[in-house]
Amino acid sequence: MEGIIIKGIGGFYYIKTDEGIIECKARGKFRYNSLKPMVGDRVTIKVENGKGVIEDIHERSSELIRPTVANVTQAFVVFAIKNPDINLDLLNRFLTLCEYNDIHAVVCLNKEDLCTEEEKENLKELINDIGYEVLFINAKEGKGFDALKERLEHNITVLCGPSGAGKSTLLNSFIDREHMETGSVSEKIGRGKHTTRHSELIDVDNGYLVDTPGFTTLDVTFIDRDSLKYCFPEFNDYNNLCKFNGCNHYKEPKCAVKEAVEEGKINKLRYDFYIKTLEEIINRRGN
């Protein structure tokens, strides 16, 4: 029987299967192989005498450390439009981490009622131009909620963003609605509102939402200097057009990315952020 781990605590794992939620323990072999089951893992289980055992952990597409979740495919990057104003460097850090982890990012701009249509259009154009979808929401009033739910289908989605952006309001809105719709499931696994630090998955519209915010650590200096450029999707059309193979678009001559910046084809603020991050990596790691 196959399923997905939606919660793990105290050595017990709760697996959602076609036959319902089954409480399981892991085989001892995983400890010997230094492989620990994670929330989000797709697993094969066996039920013996009414007790479930995890027999196999399927290959993971991704692993996040904070929160500890496997196979995340999508991130809602939540920022307030105002109060506080958008910090573009911070937004770029979140987007860089999403790209590094091969997670599809959707930028969700909260408190949309605090800005004009012109301001919204400018922000949308700016973010669309670097390759990301933008959704305008009002977490307190539930505006934009349906558009978010549409994007949850067939994904494991994590919310991320700075403090005060509205992540908790948005998350609790999802949790409250799912409590009303799936009360029996909630009772089965003992879900409460942030009563534990252990992550779990909320089943929403044929997808899952991680109940704890993602990317609580925003350090990007662990990224290899030669890999950073691949975290900027707007560079993709130019990475192979530079004179030198392996060009990092830094101090190398005849660089197609730098030419695209000069021609206005790549946003200069994004390129400046890339250079700042690259220099952080070089200075931190001395390479």
UniProtKB/Swiss-Prot annotation:
Please name the Gene3D superfamilies in this protein's record: Nucleic acid-binding proteins, P-loop containing nucleotide triphosphate hydrolases, Probable gtpase engc, domain 3
- Quick one: where is this thing mainly located? cytoplasm
Q: Which GO terms describe its cellular component?
A: cytoplasm
Question: Which residue stretches, if any, does this entry annotate as coiled coil?
Answer: none
Q: Which SUPFAM superfamilies match?
A: Nucleic acid-binding proteins (SSF50249), P-loop containing nucleoside triphosphate hydrolases (SSF52540)
User: Which of this chain's residues are annotated to bind GTP?
Assistant: 110-113, 161-169
* Alphabetized PROSITE patterns for the sequence: ENGC_GTPASE, G_CP
According to its UniProt record, where is this protein located?
A: Cytoplasm
Please state what class of enzyme this protein is.
hydrolase
- Give GO BP annotations, semicolon-separated: ribosomal small subunit biogenesis
Q: Which NCBIfam families match?
A: ribosome small subunit-dependent GTPase A
- Family to which the UniProt record says this protein belongs: Belongs to the TRAFAC class YlqF/YawG GTPase family. RsgA subfamily.
Q: What is this protein called?
A: Small ribosomal subunit biogenesis GTPase RsgA
| Provenance organism | Clostridium perfringens (strain ATCC 13124 / DSM 756 / JCM 1290 / NCIMB 6125 / NCTC 8237 / Type A)
Query: What is the name of the gene encoding this protein?
Result: rsgA
